[in-house]
Amino acid sequence: MPDTPKADIPSDNAALEAQGIASELIDDSAARIAELEAKNADLADAYLRAKAEADNIRRRADDDIAKSRKFAVESFAESLLPVKDSLEAAIVSHAAGKGSPEQVIEGVHATLRQLGQALERNKVLEVNPPAGTKFDPHQHQAISVVPAEQEANTVVAVLQKGYLIADRVLRPALVTVAAAK
C-alpha cells in the first residue's frame, strides 16, 4: 500500500462524531416539529372556539333583531288601546240610548285628542302645511294646480293631512298648489 497521509483517511472517530451530530440534529428537529404541532393544535383549537363564539354572537344578534322587529310595534299598539276602548264605550253608550249628540261630539273630540297624544308619544307627526307654504314634494302630494292670488308653487289648501315618523314620510299631505301666473 502506498503511503497516504493520515489526514486523508477518515477516522472512525470522525464518522462517529458526524453521526452523533446528525442524530442531535434529528432529535432537535423532531422536538421542534413536536413543539410546532402542539402549537398548531392549540391555534386550531383557539380558532374553532373563536369561530364558534362569533357564530353564537351572530345568532344572538339575529335573534335580537327578529325580536325587535316582532315587538317594535308593541309600544305603539299599547298606546292605541285606550283610543279603542273609548270608541267601544261610545258605541255601547249610543246603543243604550245614552248621551246627547253634543255629548257624542264631545266624546269624539276627546278620543281624537287621545289618538293625537298616542301618535305624538310614538313620534308620529302631522304634516299640515298652512296656506302659502312652499310646496315640498318630499312631504306634499299635489292633487291639483289652481289659479290663486298667492305665489306660484305654494300650498293653497290641504285636502288630507300627511304624517311623518322619525323624519320619514308615512303619508304625504294631499294639497292643492297655486298655479304660475
UniProtKB/Swiss-Prot annotation:
Localization in the cell: Cytoplasm
GO terms for cellular component: cytosol
DNA-binding in keyword set: no
GO-annotated biological processes: protein folding
Xref: Gene3D superfamilies: 3.90.20.20, Head domain of nucleotide exchange factor GrpE
GO molecular function, one term: protein homodimerization activity
Disulfide bonds: none
Record InterPro entries: GrpE (IPR000740), GrpE_coiled_coil (IPR013805), GrpE_head (IPR009012)
The entry's keywords: Chaperone, Cytoplasm, Stress response
Source organism, top-level taxon: Bacteria
A Pfam family this chain is assigned to: GrpE
Role, per record: Participates actively in the response to hyperosmotic and heat shock by preventing the aggregation of stress-denatured proteins, in association with DnaK and GrpE. It is the nucleotide exchange factor for DnaK and may function as a thermosensor. Unfolded proteins bind initially to DnaJ; upon interaction with the DnaJ-bound protein, DnaK hydrolyzes its bound ATP, resulting in the formation of a stable complex. GrpE releases ADP from DnaK; ATP binding to DnaK triggers the release of the substrate protein, thus completing the reaction cycle.
Family: Belongs to the GrpE family.
Oligomeric form and interacting partners: Homodimer.
Protein name: Protein GrpE
Source species: Leptothrix cholodnii (strain ATCC 51168 / LMG 8142 / SP-6)
Lineage of origin: Bacteria, Pseudomonadati, Pseudomonadota, Betaproteobacteria, Burkholderiales
